[in-house]
Amino acid sequence: MKILKPITFRKPRIISQKKVLRSKLSKVKKSPWYKAKKNYVSFRQRLVLAKKNPNKKRYYLFFSKKRNNVFLTITDVIGRVVVSQSAGSCKITTKKKKRSPDTLKTVSASVAKIARAKNIKYLFKFFMNTNQTKIGKTIFESFKKTGLFILQGVVVKNKSHGLLMRKKKAKRL
């Protein structure tokens, strides 16, 4: 034996509710020169998209300047290290030489050469933990000379150099 459900009728809308609906619809239309804001896509969302589309390659440049050393790392979207160089790996051994401004140029030039050899043309983002524009400019210039272009610069407040990347010894140079 079936149990019959009671039939319920939808309540009619009150006049004030109808007015609210109409006013909301009219506010949606904007002036002709209005541009909608682009949605910010978080790094995690980008990661998911990268895993779905492995052919779409984007690379990030991480820069970290310590008191006695300079680190430059290029990673892919997933976080695997493609190129990693420091003053020590460029055979600059003494502390005095590591502190000099020329070390940054030599390290960035060597990173750029390796990146071009691996067929990297664009770096999507450039992360650095300080807001020192001089350092950023020197890196940008040395990368431009070799034909590498950085599309966007970002200052990261978190000081860890290993931010957003997983280091794998097999991938490192």
Curated annotation (Swiss-Prot):
Lineage: superkingdom: Eukaryota
Recorded GO CC terms: mitochondrion; ribonucleoprotein complex; ribosome
MF (Gene Ontology): structural constituent of ribosome
Pfam families: Ribosomal_S11 (PF00411)
Record keyword RNA-binding present: no
GO BP terms: translation
Keyword tags: Mitochondrion, Ribonucleoprotein, Ribosomal protein
Residue ranges of coiled coil: none
Compartments, record wording: Mitochondrion
Family stated for the protein in its record: Belongs to the universal ribosomal protein uS11 family.
Protein name: Small ribosomal subunit protein uS11m
Lineage: Eukaryota, Amoebozoa, Discosea, Longamoebia, Centramoebida
